[in-house]
Amino acid sequence: MAYSSCLNRSLKPNKLLLRRIDGAIQVRSHVDLTFYSLVGSGRSGGGTTAPLFSRIHTSLISVWRAISRAQVEVRPQWENGAPNNASSQTKNYEITLSFWGDGGIVPFEPFFHAFPGGLEKAAINRTSLILPS
């Protein structure tokens, strides 16, 4: 069975397992039915009638909420070897998000376009996740 960073809505955050492999954060979910549509494995999406974009959007927002609630060990990005005190409101973390699928690790980057502007607590771009202090 494939593992994914997408969550079923009924799956509570404490059922989520985060682990780091080669610098990538892996989020496992044994329950998700929409993940197969995301990686194109040819399996059914579980009979859901929602459009693919809607399922991707819902899944990405769910994974963001799960990551924001989880305690993830990451190293802050320092400039010139010292903390950047000018940006005390936010800290930048270099995080590589990815899915774990049947064919191995699938980079998360192709799905960033599915995030709406202005997430609740963070701004996500291709290379970093900015968390509030």
Swiss-Prot record:
Localization of this protein: Plastid, Chloroplast
Superkingdom, taxonomy of origin: Eukaryota
Transmembrane segments: none
Principal location class: plastid
Pfam families for this protein: DUF2647
UniProt keyword list: Chloroplast, Plastid
The keyword Glycosyltransferase appears for this protein: no
GO cellular component, one term: chloroplast
Annotated family: Belongs to the ycf68 family.
Record protein name field: Uncharacterized protein ycf68
Organism: Oryza sativa subsp. indica
Organism taxonomic ancestry: Eukaryota, Viridiplantae, Streptophyta, Embryophyta, Tracheophyta
Gene for this chain: ycf68-1
